[in-house]
Amino acid sequence: MNTAASIVCLGSWNTRIFTPSWVSEKVFSMSEGESMEIGLNEQQLNLFYKWKGIILLMLDNRLEFRSDNCSHESLSMMELFYQRLSELLPYTPVIGVGFNINLTLTHEEYAGTSICGLIERRNLDIYSNNSQTFSAEKDGAFRSFVIQMNADNVEIRANFHYSDPKKVPTVGTTFSIIEKELKHFLGYEFSLC
């Protein structure tokens, strides 16, 4: 099983604030002597910062923390960075916050879930999009689960979107809630990391 995670904050971000020194000191709280990777997002021509496996990508209307190699440490760090940013920039108009988990399961792993009959592995050579979306609103979040099957694997995307950032659970719990909901939804015991 492969896992990736992200926190997406929609709002009116002043990306000029996000200088390398400000990000390293205020957001990442890096110690002296530590360094971070600075790169260019070629699609949007914006800078991104990467430290300890966490990528901070800034666009005018969206800010994203992303980890492609999910671990309990990276999930906790992303939530902590999101909280710091909320405290550092309290007057930034934020219109929504999304917590996302993307799982990639083998067909054998997917067969062990209680929902495997919802999308069957058939006609994959004919049809390119065998997917199903499930969604509901609960505890201030719009929750959606998307299951997409292809010839190689099964992708499951979980998104918890809060249109009111004040309803986001306390730091350190949001990804735990998503993991618990995914286990319940899939009927499958696993660890995100």
Where is each model-derived feature located?
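Charged surface patches that recognize polyanionic ligands
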Residues: 70-129
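Mixed-charge, glycine-accented linear interaction segment located at domain edges/termini
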Residues: 140-193
